[in-house]
Amino acid sequence: MSELSFDAPVWRHGKALRKGYTTGSCATAAAKVAALMVLRQHLIHQVSIVTPSGVTLCLNVESPHIEGQQAIAAIRKDGGDDVDATHGMLIFARVTLNDSGEITLTGGEGIGTVTRKGVGLPLGSAAINRTPRHTIESAVREAIGPARGADVEIFAPEGEARAQKTYNSRLGILGGISIIGTTGIVTPMSEESWKRSLSLELEIKRASGLTRVILVPGNHGERFVREQMGVDTQAVVTMSNFVGYMIEEAVRLGFCQIVLVGHPGKLIKIAAGIFHTHSHIADARMETLVAHLALLGAPLELLTLVSDCDTTEAAMEHIEAYGFGHIYNHLARRICLRVMQMLRFTKTPPVCDAILFSFDNHILGSNRPVDEIAKELQC
């Protein structure tokens, strides 16, 4: 990525969005400038780094401080126009020079600790991912030269509080934020980074020994699993709108059973072969309902009423009034059929189940008895 492409906005739905930089870039810049300040013994207020993607960032330094052979500096995280829990917080680095010739990197206050397998870092280590570890160590080495050593501590006083707004606790990263970023640049509303974070949770579940997974669109699905199915929510992973992607990831990781649980407003799209359920990709909810109601022999009056509905909930009221509630079992079976069609070239496809529920947490339908599915999930 060139500097020009970094400055150029990302266009989403006709709106220009500004790029930002990652916590990894902040930590790298903070460590570099702290190392330089120790060597030069004077405060520095601006520092430049080259990100892994080749972009040169020139960043303002905050809270610079020197005390003997130790210096501290901070960089303020700027996520651009991305929705980011770490936006605006300070990422600090403390660099202490020594004669060991080695660079050691640790995480201090506000940096999470890895407590589960699956994130690619040793248990008990600081949640500083591999790419930022490399860039931090390289930047410090460049600053101090080949002979000196340094102890580098990355810390973030707001980290523990900010981490409450992230997926870290679900990933087994406790006590703070993660220092992340493979490119060093934050692309606003990047689907790829969002998908990757969801997939990472799948990897952690699999690494913990789970072989069966429940995919839900969001928090409502997890609550239903806990309250109505009596199943440990450790098996639940959010798929958001990325149904096809998360199913393929679950297959790649070797899960033997995938259970899709959600409200018809989301899952009905899968019955039509739509595996990205965001409304800007496709809708077809009413068309799908009308088609399958017709297959079940629904009267034209009901088909017309459903066709004119704007929401799935409104359509469900008509379906109930006409006594066609059995469509939900039919749709659940159709969802499973569509998933198996998508996985038709998979050598050992997993068992697929689907459960539909209402907003008041009542079971609407499933491809087979829910008790049977729940029993298997508890094995």
From Swiss-Prot:
Gene: cbiD
SUPFAM superfamilies in alphabetical order: CbiD-like
Pathways involved: Cofactor biosynthesis; adenosylcobalamin biosynthesis; cob(II)yrinate a,c-diamide from sirohydrochlorin (anaerobic route): step 6/10
Keywords, alphabetical: Cobalamin biosynthesis, Methyltransferase, S-adenosyl-L-methionine, Transferase
Protein name: Cobalt-precorrin-5B C(1)-methyltransferase
Membrane-crossing residue ranges in chain numbering: none
High-level lineage: Bacteria, Pseudomonadati, Pseudomonadota, Gammaproteobacteria, Enterobacterales
GO BP annotation list: anaerobic cobalamin biosynthetic process; methylation
A GO molecular-function descriptor: cobalt-precorrin-5B C1-methyltransferase activity
Pfam family, one: CbiD
InterPro entries: CbiD (IPR002748), CbiD_sf (IPR036074)
Matching HAMAP family: CbiD (MF_00787)
EC class (word): transferase
Reaction(s) catalysed by this chain's protein: Co-precorrin-5B + S-adenosyl-L-methionine = Co-precorrin-6A + S-adenosyl-L-homocysteine
The keyword Transferase belongs to this UniProt entry's keyword annotation: yes
Cystine connections: none
Organism: Salmonella paratyphi B (strain ATCC BAA-1250 / SPB7)
Enzyme Commission identifier(s): 2.1.1.195
Similarity remark: Belongs to the CbiD family.
